[in-house]
Amino acid sequence: MARGGGKSGSLKDKLDGNELDLSLCGLSEVPVRELAALPKATVLDLSCNSLVSLPSDFCSLTHLVKLDLSKNRLQQLPVDFGRLVSLQHLDLLNNRLVTLPVSFAQLKLSLHHSPVEILSRLLGTPSSLLVFHSFHSWENQNLKWLDLKDNPLDPVLAKVAGDCLDEKQCKQAAVRVLQHMKVIQSEQDRERQRKLQAEREMEKKREAEQRAREAQERELRKREKAEEKERRRREYDAQRAAKQEMEKKTKKETVQTRKLASSSRPPQPARHKHSWSRSVLRALLLVLLCILCTLAVCKLTELQHQPLCVSVNTLYEDVVAAVQNHKTLQNMLQQNSQQ
């Protein structure tokens, strides 16, 4: 099979005014890049080729007004086929199409040829449900001619499309099919909105549940913290009470021990008095020793002529004389007492 993709120069050779005839060329692919370079070619005939599908970039050929894809092997149209908004005439005769993309509803149409009640009767849908797609919203829209004959269409779509045996039927087919696709698009939009709303509500519910859980967790932590604080306070009070009790017990035992110790030993004041007497006696002995040493120095050494020693010797002699007088007086008293 021949492949599309010849140079734009070779396509220009087939261009006749605004019509480009690529029928019966054995094409298995559409030369989209070369076609995009010929925006003047608003009428394109690709019939009687071996096309199985159309590339997604085919939808960029928005300058097309009339498109003939009849007698190929197309199994589906690109998802964005509705981007061909300038399209007024579309021939899809004798392909292998089962459904049409939802974007097909964007191909636009003019309702001057058929009222909404036609689709209402075909689909068994109350016309009030189709009022949303009003004449006002479509009055300047484009697609006017459509042929879907000899395709294994979905039964509902086949019933909507009907026959295309003459100009009038093909125009009515365009109206009916686009209305049908508009309804499907609206239903999908509503379903999408419903799912989106459900997801939002579910998200809000999850957020509310999360906030509730967080609030419960905060309350639980707060309660646990308060309980822990109360437990520690009780432990502190218990330890403090035990410490005070131990101090009281220790103090009591100390008092009792002191009482027992004081009752089992002699009184301390006499002991202190005896020690004081010894200290006084030692002091007196030390003074007496000093006096004797001084007398010895003043009597036996060359210092006896010094003024200090002279005074000491004089005092010594006076004391000795006084003692002797005292002994004489004492002897006299003893004698008198014996008589």
Swiss-Prot record:
Alphabetized Pfam families for the sequence: LRR_8
Coiled-coil annotated spans: 181-254
Start and end residues of each stretch annotated as Disordered: 186-275
Membrane topology value: Single-pass type II membrane protein
Cytoplasmic side: 1-282
UniProt subunit comment: Interacts with SGO1.
Residues in the Lumenal compartment per record: 301-339
Superkingdom classification of source: Eukaryota
Organism: Gallus gallus (Chicken)
Record's function text: Required for nuclear import of FGF1.
Chain segments annotated as transmembrane: 283-300
Keywords: Coiled coil, Endoplasmic reticulum, Leucine-rich repeat, Membrane, Microsome, Nucleus, Repeat, Signal-anchor, Transmembrane, Transmembrane helix
Major localisation: membrane
Subcellular location(s) of the protein: Microsome membrane; Endoplasmic reticulum membrane; Nucleus envelope
SUPFAM superfamilies, sorted: L domain-like (SSF52058)
Gene3D superfamilies linked to this entry: Ribonuclease Inhibitor
Protein name as catalogued: Leucine-rich repeat-containing protein 59
Bias (Basic and acidic residues): 187-256
Start and stop residues of the LRR repeats: 10-31, 40-61, 63-84, 86-107
GO CC annotation: endoplasmic reticulum membrane; nuclear envelope
